Amino acid sequence: MKIGIIGAGAAGMVAAINVANENNEVFILEHTSKIGSKIRISGNGKCNLTNESVSKEKYNNQDFADVVLNEFSVNDTKQFFYNCGLMLKDKNGYYYPMSEQAASVIDVLQSELYKRNVKLITDFHITRMHRKDDKFIIKGNNKEIIADKLIIATGGKSAAKTGSDGSGYSYAKMFGHNIIEQV
């Protein structure tokens, strides 16, 4: 199966690592020139990966948060990075890479993508997407790429200079999804 992922941030790379196996051909499309741009600046460049105080009570939609946190817990997050070869440092319940450098996180994620033969395509600017005969057709950079499954992992509008410019909302709309406006 050919699986396409739009966005090479933390969510896109982790999704690719989780679905890449001998049965799946996985590619990531990133519209900037670098992967993990927002990771590089998170935690003032130290990249806080998770913390022990994560709970559903800290979210507006507690039912949804409960489902998500039960599916992939703080311990699951720590184990994921350990399995990728990243040693973590606990600072009062907040977890950082041992190096305290966000670049370490990007390096281990990129290494895992390479081990799993995930194809990274940077500077790819999507102009159109649609679904035809159970396939996803993605057009951009004078190319057409076809996928059996598609994951949109573009982030929100939090940091346009890193690539989180809200483009994922328009991509989701192309497939008929409703977008709930931010408050």
Mark where each language-model region is:
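N-terminal Rossmann-like FAD-binding beta1-loop-alpha1 element of flavoenzymes
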Residues: K2-I28
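Residue-level detector of alpha-helix initiation sites
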Residues: I5, G9-A10, K34, G156-S158
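Redox-cofactor binding/interface segments in oxidoreductases and associated redox assembly factors
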Residues: I6, I41, I152-A153
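Short N-terminal binding/cap micro-motifs at the start of the first secondary-structure element
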Residues: G12-V14, I35-K38
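Glycine-rich active-site loop/strand segments that organize a redox cofactor
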Residues: N44-N92
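Short beta-strand to alpha-helix junction loop
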Residues: A65-S73, N92-S111, K157-S164
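Residue-level signal for inorganic ion chemistry
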Residues: F81, L109, A172
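Predominantly flavin-linked oxidoreductase catalytic cores and closely associated redox partners
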Residues: S104, Y114-V183
